[in-house]
Amino acid sequence: MKDTMKKILLRLTSFAVMGLSMTQVHAEEVPFLKNSAILGSLLSYGFAAINKDNFQACTPNRKASIQTGSDEELSSVSLGFSVSDCALKPAAQPMGLQFVISPTVIASGWSSNSGPGARSLTELTLVPKVQYVLPYGSLRWDVTVGVGISLLSKSSVGSRIKSTNFQFSDEIGFGVSDAADKLRIGFTYRHISNLGISVPNNGVDFRGLTLTYKL
């Protein structure tokens, strides 16, 4: 189980390295946020792989989320669902921060009111999110990063030509939740592209609010 996790994390790290090398490909990207998402994911997956023997047993923890996002042309609404958390043992936590990996499935609907492409599409994403949590008083402050794989129902929407239905999704978010982690609200940035597998490769940069509820 731990060896499988290490292989998955190393593969995701290699994808993150590829993504970092493509940071100047598209003018519409937000370089600081995209670079932070990819570099943060790369370092986090690498750290997790190195510390694979220091994880506690994964525990059931069902959460559902809704996220709204938009860029200069497109808008999206996403529903997310995760069923478990895999946390590092307290002695191995980086700088005293809780380090938690939550495999998450996300279903999204995109829409556009301009351009020659489709007016809407559906996206399905799988991403192992890494969350750094700092409990402080009655609140929990966090930073979340992750790189995952996405499948689009169409390869173009609005004026964005994606060329492939298969895409990569990298994200970074900042949030706050109550002490019991029952309800969380945060900001999320998400970039979707195919890493230059095929061109044109018009990236999409969604920024918006996320609301997460523990079921």
Predicted segments with their positions:
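Transmembrane beta-strand segments of Gram-negative outer membrane beta-barrel proteins
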Residues: 55-70, 97-105
